Design a protein with these regions (language model features):
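A short glycine/small-residue-enriched secondary-structure motif
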Residues: 23-36, 75, 97-112
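Active-site loop segments of alpha/beta catalytic cores
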Residues: 1-40, 53, 57, 65-72, ...
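N-terminal accessory alpha/beta regions
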Residues: 56-90
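Aromatic- and acidic-residue-enriched carbohydrate-binding clefts of CAZyme catalytic domains
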Residues: 88-110, 217-231
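Outer-membrane beta-barrel proteins
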Residues: 45-47
Length: 355
């Protein structure tokens, strides 16, 4: 954890912290249950969190000896806040839950008139029941409880949540009624804050100002997902979407922003937001990372889950590109491949230290 804190504060570090993702081998000792069962039994959800969450494997941590933290979350998908906006989530077979929009679209007027008591909603109750089970297990196994961090669930962000409910109409409304969209996003942000306040007492984050999501440590107390920003201009983000993000980050005492895809068109605007403390990339390789890193270093905003290529790791050149301020994740072919790459990475770090 100390290595993470050093990197997240742009301090000198022996090496960049790294995690390894890979598919579960058919002959692996620990096999995840099919996804459908995690929604039927909290013990299965708990087990799968340890065996294979985001293709990260806490059960292999002692073999790889990487920097994977031991974290578990109520894994009820991306629909928790969206479930409060008028459409119940659906879940079938091994798919993750989703929102199926109705034939009659939900409008900005519908969002504005909503009066929600979040405790009455089934998805909120599901998460609370999962938290309660997790705490029963931790209480029964106190040594494990000392190791594990129970985190917030995936609450998305105001823009991604409203997009789930409204679909393409949201983007039309952003052009025709930008102020009403901004107000709707702020309403969704307030609902998200209610969820945070309800779930936070169940979380066991140990260091104020830092939290865990996506199998890694962040600087900030909340991760706002902003995948849908890849589809809008920086100006639209700044004028319409950012106020909701700023509200949340101020309310929680600082936060992080996440986006998958190619997001470098908007990072300059995001790095100026009040309250932003780190930035998580789902697909760093799609972006101009050298330009992003220069700006991040200037603003002291650490970059989370940058994905190096194999040669950068085994040669150690990744440390020349990013001396600090970056955490890494590497997509391996298998557990054995992860072990080999990590050993090569550590040898490269040691060679550089001796120069």
């Amino acid at each position: 954890m100390n290595r993470y804190k050093q990197v997240l504060n742009f301090e000198p570090v022996d090496r960049l912290p790294i995690t390894y993702s890979y598919p579960v081998s058919p002959d692996a000792r620990w096999q995840p249950f099919p996804n459908r069962y995690i929604y039927q039994n909290p013990a299965v959800m708990f087990y799968n969190e340890l065996v294979s969450a985001w293709d990260l494997h806490i059960t292999d941590r002692a073999l790889i000896l990487d920097d994977l933290p031991v974290t578990i979350r109520p894994n009820w998908g991306t629909v928790t806040v969206a479930s409060l906006l008028g459409i119940p989530p659906e879940q079938r077979d091994d798919q993750t839950p989703w929102i199926r929009r109705r034939d009659e679209n939900i409008t900005l007027e519908d969002i504005g008139s909503l009066d929600v008591d979040i405790r009455e909603y089934r998805w909120i109750q599901n998460i609370l029941e999962t938290y309660e089970y997790y705490h029963e297990v931790v209480a029964a196994y106190p040594k494990f409880g000392e190791m594990v961090t129970i985190t917030l669930p995936d609450l998305q962000g105001p823009f991604d949540t409203l997009e789930q409910i409204m679909g393409e109409q949201l983007f039309i409304d952003m052009v025709l009624e930008p102020e009403r969209v901004k107000e709707s996003l702020l309403k969704v942000a307030r609902l998200q804050k209610e969820c945070i306040d309800l779930f936070q007492p169940y979380c066991t984050e140990q260091i104020p100002g830092y939290s865990h999501q996506h199998g890694t440590m962040l600087k900030g107390n909340l991760l706002i997902r902003n995948d849908s920003v890849v589809m809008i201009s920086p100006r639209m983000y700044e004028d319409i979407v950012a106020p909701g993000d700023i509200f949340l980050m101020k309310e929680v005492g600082g936060g992080a922003i996440h986006s998958c895809g190619k997001i470098d068109h908007a990072t300059d605007v995001m790095f100026e937001l009040e309250g932003i403390q780190s930035f998580d990339l789902g697909q760093s390789y799609l972006n101009d990372m050298d330009r992003i890193y220069r700006k991040a270093k200037e603003k002291k905003i650490p970059l989370i889950r940058v994905q190096p290529d194999r040669e950068e790791l085994i040669s150690g050149s990744i440390l020349e590109r990013y001396p600090t301020g970056v955490t890494l994740t590497f997509r391996s072919q298998s557990r054995d491949d992860a072990i080999q790459v990590h050993e090569a990475y550590k040898r490269a770090v040691e060679r550089r230290r001796k120069k």
